[in-house]
Design a protein with these regions (language model features):
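Active/binding-pocket-proximal capping segment
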Residues: 70-71, 98, 129-140, 195-196
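Active-site-adjacent bridging/hinge elements
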Residues: 20-27, 144-156
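Cytochrome P450 heme-thiolate monooxygenase catalytic domain
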Residues: 1-20, 171-174, 219
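Cytochrome P450 heme-binding "Cys pocket" and the immediately downstream C-terminal segment
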Residues: 170-204
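Conserved cytochrome P450 K-helix E-x-x-R motif and the immediately C-terminal K′/meander segment
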Residues: 68-107, 111, 116-117
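Central I-helix of cytochrome P450 enzymes
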Residues: 14-68, 175
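Conserved cytochrome P450 K-helix/beta-meander segment immediately N-terminal to the heme-binding cysteine loop
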Residues: 117-146
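Hydrophobic, well-ordered secondary-structure elements that form the walls
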Residues: 81, 112, 161, 167, ...
């Protein structure tokens, strides 16, 4: 059977975002977005959720706020956790001739050239204050401090503009619901020490460089 369509659900929002595009490009775009969401929910979503939990277990004050009903704090919290552990690769198309210096060499890039950039290179280094986890960097899902950077794209979680991940809202909702239920129903105790993103990972949200066990007991 086919489940009834819920008004305003994720699929409906995807369809609306392609409403201005003529057929068959519209249907192709919708299908591709659905595939991206499916792939993300199988891998990167769980990594993002895990890092949110890891950072959260170091902040008992935030856990108590969630237990008191403040689920909204998980929105900026999860975005900051993803910023710190993002390892995605993004292709940038050169739109004007530029000279790119690399050590002693200079590369002349012409319009149309595709350059691969790693979010992890600038997410924590574009400014000194980005090196540490700070929930105040985000207001909800918005990064208001982008005006303090040379370019807003230097810090990325779910992408910018047309490159924004179509699973953004879904992922944030899933993380918020899962983590809030965990901390309300269980006492959690980390059985790991100082995990870091795997240094050689390319693409997606990082996996941890070690096993991260968590002991739990029902509240």
């Amino acid at each position: 059977c086919i489940a009834p369509r819920a008004e305003g659900d994720l699929f409906e929002r995807i369809c609306e975002s392609w409403a201005h595009v003529p057929s068959p490009e519209r249907e192709i775009g919708i299908a591709r977005d659905v595939i991206v969401i499916h792939m993300g929910s199988q891998a990167n979503l769980f990594a993002a959720m895990a890092w949110t939990l890891i950072f959260l277990l170091a902040r008992p004050d935030v856990i108590e706020r969630i237990r008191a009903g403040d689920d909204g704090i998980l929105n900026p919290f999860s975005h900051e956790a993803i910023r710190m552990t993002q390892r995605s690769i993004v292709l940038r198309r050169v739109v004007a001739p530029i000279d790119f210096e690399q050590g002693n060499a200079i590369h002349h890039l012409l319009p149309g050239t595709l350059v691969s950039t790693m979010m992890s290179v600038t997410n924590t280094t574009a400014a000194p204050w980005l090196a540490k986890f700070d929930i105040s960097n985000y207001r909800g899902s918005v990064f208001p401090r982008s005006r303090e950077l040379a370019a807003p794209e230097l810090v990325t979680t779910y992408g910018h503009g047309k490159h924004t991940c179509p699973a953004h809202r879904f992922s944030t909702s899933a993380i918020t619901q899962a983590i809030s239920e965990l901390v309300r129903h269980f006492d959690l105790e980390p059985r790991y020490k100082d995990p870091h993103p795997r240094p050689r990972q390319l693409g997606g949200v990082a996996r941890a460089d070690r096993l991260c066990k968590i002991a739990y007991s029902r509240r």
